[in-house]
Design a protein with these regions (language model features):
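Conserved interdomain hinge at the start of the Helicase C-terminal
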Residues: 137-139
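Substrate-binding cleft of secreted/luminal carbohydrate-active enzymes
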Residues: 141-162
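Active-site-proximal helices and loops of the catalytic beta/alpha 8
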Residues: 6-107, 112, 133, 143, ...
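Alpha-helix capping/termination and helix-coil
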Residues: 123, 148-151, 211-215
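Surface beta-strand/loop "capping" patches
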Residues: 217-239
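Short coil/turn segments at secondary-structure boundaries
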Residues: 112, 155-157, 219-223
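Active-site clefts of carbohydrate-active enzymes
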Residues: 108-132
Length: 240
């Protein structure tokens, strides 16, 4: 009402009392219907995550009233899928197809937060050497920004920042280079980024500009087909 924010992320949502959080979510969204609450639901299967979404059949007759939950299982599948160049039905792009065929467990798959990484997980690239495979970045980014759900992009992804959780959470949350007087390099400026970082930055920028205002991609139903010879085809349709 005063801050003008569109929503908040509720940390470790399932840790709190179910009924209290249900009442709170309902009270907030009844008063501010355009305000969204994203619940951190860090669970390892879509069945478990789906329990916490508003109107879940699995939770009935109880109702969390939490509109948006975080799709951690899809994050895991994406990080594996784009590393596996295979046509097998148990790996590669088939992981994405197989996972999305199970969306019926969710009350509203369109209100899932989808992401490649975040401040609690290893970054999409574990180290600088891995960033040399920029095709992995491009394929994953296209999927993230065209599949169902609400995409979230962790800062630094646009310049291929890399970090392994095994080296501590501090590595995952390193400052973005630049923005402060004494930073040795300012990656807010094209001239200070490497050619590869500029390639990644421009690629994301173009994708986001294309997606902005695109109701088909943002709201359309997803139709997909089983991967064939390493090719995964899907489409989005909105209205007629």
């Amino acid at each position: 009402e005063y801050a003008g924010i569109n929503g908040i992320r509720q940390d470790t949502h399932p840790y709190a009392d179910f009924d209290m959080m249900s009442e709170w979510c309902k009270a907030v969204t009844d008063e501010y219907p355009d305000f969204n609450i994203v619940g951190e639901t860090w669970l390892n299967s879509n069945v478990l995550v789906s329990f916490w979404q508003k109107d879940s059949r699995l939770a009935a007759p109880r109702n969390s009233n939490l509109r948006t939950v975080m799709d951690f299982p899809l994050m895991e599948q994406m990080n594996k899928a784009f590393d596996e160049e295979t046509t097998d039905w148990n790996g590669g792009l088939y992981r994405l197809y197989d996972y999305l065929t199970q969306d019926l467990v969710y009350a509203d798959p369109m209100n899932l937060l989808v992401f490649l990484d975040n401040h609690d997980t290893s970054r999409f690239y574990l180290n600088e050497e891995a960033t040399q495979n920029i095709d992995r970045y491009k394929q994953a980014l296209v999927f993230l920004l065209t599949t169902r759900g609400i995409p979230q992009i962790y800062y630094g992804t646009e310049i291929l920042m890399a970090a392994d959780k095994a080296n501590g959470d501090g590595r995952l949350r390193c400052d973005f280079p630049g923005g402060w007087k004494y930073d040795p390099r300012n990656c807010f400026y094209e001239a200070n980024r490497t050619p590869q970082q500029n390639e990644a930055f421009t690629y994301m920028q173009k994708l986001l500009q294309w997606r902005k205002g695109n109701e088909v991609i943002a709201k359309g139903r997803l139709k997909h087909f089983a991967p064939n010879k390493g090719i995964y085809v899907y489409a989005r349709k909105y209205g007629n």
